[in-house]
Amino acid sequence: MMATDYYIVGNLRKDYEESYSKLGHRWKDYAQRKYDIIDKVQKDGLLLVGINPSFDESFKGSCEGEVRDSENGGYRHPYFTKPKKLNEEIGISDFSHVDMFSLRSRPQHVVQDIVNDPDSQGFVEEQLRLFRMIVDGASPRAIVVVNALASHLIRTGRALGALDYDDVLGVAMYKIGEKRVPVFYSGMLSGAHTIDNGSFDRLIWHIKYVLNMQSVFF
């Protein structure tokens, strides 16, 4: 049995830490929270993409940067329950999830505001560069984007550059070398605005269909 291979996200912690010096001054309180990243993601598996880690907004003051242990509580938050179920249904890899931004905030509009802030573009571009490094390093078999803003940044080409669209399979394709990686856009899988069960089942079917067709014809 082959050993599981991983891309080590934790090796980028210094780059993540340094990126906060490029965050606009109005966001200094968020800069003090520093980064929150997962330690690793599985290569050649299913990669789920969110927008940013949550945070207990009642906490005040600075934090230490955190590299969460994926095998020991790194995915313990209830948010990951439905994404884990999706991963189990697809069944091609261990659970792997990465956020596009490492900034800690519960209200997601904060990330949207930072993306739109002219004084924070250095931070945004550096975070997206690191995100691309993770995706390219993991070289997943499929990407599932489970956040509207993350989907927008990918669809518009800002996060991963221009994607091709496969009209036959009905999915966008991201190229890593010669490898064509299907990108599926989904609504939230957890929380107040989660997709309904029918849409969830359809997502599972579509992912399985595309992966099966790729294995047959590519």
Residue spans for each PLM region:
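Active-site and ligand/interface coordination hotspots across diverse enzymes
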Residues: 1-75, 79-85, 127-130, 134, ...
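Short, solvent-exposed loop/turn segments at secondary-structure junctions
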Residues: 52-56, 101-105, 148-152, 188-192
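Glycine-rich, phosphate-binding/catalytic loops in enzymes
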Residues: 63-68, 114, 159-163
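Low-complexity, serine/threonine/proline-enriched polar segments
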Residues: 68-109
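Proline-aspartate-enriched helix->loop->beta-strand connector
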Residues: 131-148
